[in-house]
Amino acid sequence: MPKKINIPEPEENLKFIDVHCHLPFHRPKRDQLPSDKVQYLNYFKLGGQYLITSTIDMQTLNFTLDFMKKFGRNFGFTCGWAPQTVTYTPKEKYDLEWKNWLAFIQNNQDKYLAIGEIGLDFHHAKTLKKRTKQVEVLKQIFELTKDLEKPYILHVRNAAEHEFDRQNPKHRFNKKDGVNKEILNILKEFKIEPQRVMWHCFSGPEEYGRTLPNQGFTLSVPSSAYGFNRWRRVTKFSPLESLVTETDSYYQHPFKRGPLNVPSNVRYSIAAIAFSHNIPQKTVSEKTVENAIKFFKLEIKG
């Protein structure tokens, strides 16, 4: 559990947009969550303006498309091939699913909001071989999609100290910001404008919370920033104009660990930003909704 601090609870009547959740999704083990339908309805009942879910492979893409047949109002999705997908998909399935995923994003551009989540995760990929594979696939994605004029949603996770590749101790991937630097170099290589890129569930390092917004990137603050200072401090000095809010549910609960989060808890992201920036929650609510609408070009139905 996080250390208790005196952060005000989310105020009533806030408007909000969760720009990154995983609803619907296959139910987690030890499932304690309301049904997908109940989570969706509660989200809008409490002030949600639009809900964006992130797919990570063909299975979650198909799951989402099926859900949207019943619950598609003010609900959209991003189409991703996550770094975990690269690392964990069995070889016998990978080539066909990759081919099908590419075909979908190229032939169905009107159905999804952005490409993502995509990126690098050196927690899940711990060897140089696996990390290099993630880099190669990310480059392929940019090469094949850069002309689609879609935004990108990045999954960025640096290796922790205990996750360094001991067989290649001096490799650049082992640095505390190794993933950040690698991704910035790749974006530059493929001439991807920062204004097209959102760093989902931004986790730092702290200096990047200052420099990335100055370059034009958008940073997403998770609901866990409410109860866990390590998530809150990395955007403490980021301008509000560069921030959006997310839950990454069912993980990243505001003050608990485990698969317990729901999209309506994005209100806690608003409360966390208001606390770290010392500004009213209503101001954060209004600006982050505006930022999300602008980034994704959302059309909200009344």
Residue ranges and their predicted role:
Residues 1-302:
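Mid-domain alpha/beta scaffold segments of enzyme catalytic cores
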